[in-house]
Amino acid sequence: SILMENNKITAIGEIPLDTDAKVIDVKGKWITPGIIDIHSHMGVYPAPGLRSNSDGNEATNPVTPHVWAEHSVWTHDPQFTLALKGGITTFHVLPGSANLIGGRGVTLKNVRSVTVQGMKFPGAPYTLKMACGENPKRVYGGKNKEPSTRMGNVAGYRKAWINAQDYQNKLKEYESKSDEAKELEYAPSRDLELETLVGVLDGEILIQNHCYRGEEMAVMLDIAKEFGYKVTAFHHAIEAYKVADILADNGVCAAMWADWWGFKHEAFDMVWENAAIVDQANGGKGCA
């Protein structure tokens, strides 16, 4: 038996029941823990899909770490109820993949609340959405802006991280001064873009990287090593099986579809065994 009180499991086993307890016979069925959706756009692309309510991509600049997905979440999105019926009790809301650096993601509990603050999962760290490949170069190349190529993508990431390191060094230099010295000069001005990137460099914000092709994942790891941050997971990762050992060696997870691919060029080279290959890489040290 499983005892639930106030929507939470409070006991499992042989449980004496109160006479007023509601009993549901689920013999022959599966009971699982709540499902965590690790890549969601619920709330920022709510149903019905209207342009006036589509707030997941700030596609005005390829680098927008200053925007936060939680500031777009519509807490009345009917998709939340449908997801709950499917067993999803927690979900990670990310900005879309139009930008090289798309903004902060947030982890929410699937509970009713008028405010997004009331839905936040306690203690969950912020994340940062990055995207490589077709989407950024298509969105901005189509506007005759940089990036329009994959090498333009990489240049954009590197410029952003160089600026972040400069800002981080200024903050460290100021904090290293004595109290007397601090009184004689101003602290570095707040910069919303660079604050988020420095949060990544300081290990407080976790990178979630939209990426399909194997060689591009390897390039993103090269950039991470150059600037001293860690990629937590590659999302979609259609070709992760090609670099499974590299991902395992670097402690990087892959968040993948089990059976969906082929909907655009970079999503063609998939194998059914993708998730299994990544999970079992290097003697079972992979993460999928």
Q: Which residues make up each language-model segment?
A:
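His/Asp/Glu-enriched, well-ordered alpha-helical/loop segment
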Residues: A47-P48, S54-V67, L206, D245-A288
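Active-site environment of divalent metal-dependent phosphoester hydrolases
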Residues: M42-Y45, T75, A98-G102, G214-A218, ...
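Histidine-rich, glycine-flanked metal-binding segment
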Residues: S1-T32
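Solvent-exposed loop/turn segments at secondary-structure junctions
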Residues: T10, W30-I31, S40-G43, S97-N99, ...
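Polyanionic/metal-chelating signatures
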Residues: Q79, L84-A233
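Metal-associated gating/positioning segment near the N- to mid-region
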Residues: V26-P95, N99-L100
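Generic beta-strand/beta-sheet core signal
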Residues: E5, L94, H210-Y212, F234-A237, ...
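Divalent metal-coordination and catalytic microenvironments
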Residues: I2, N7, G28, H39, ...
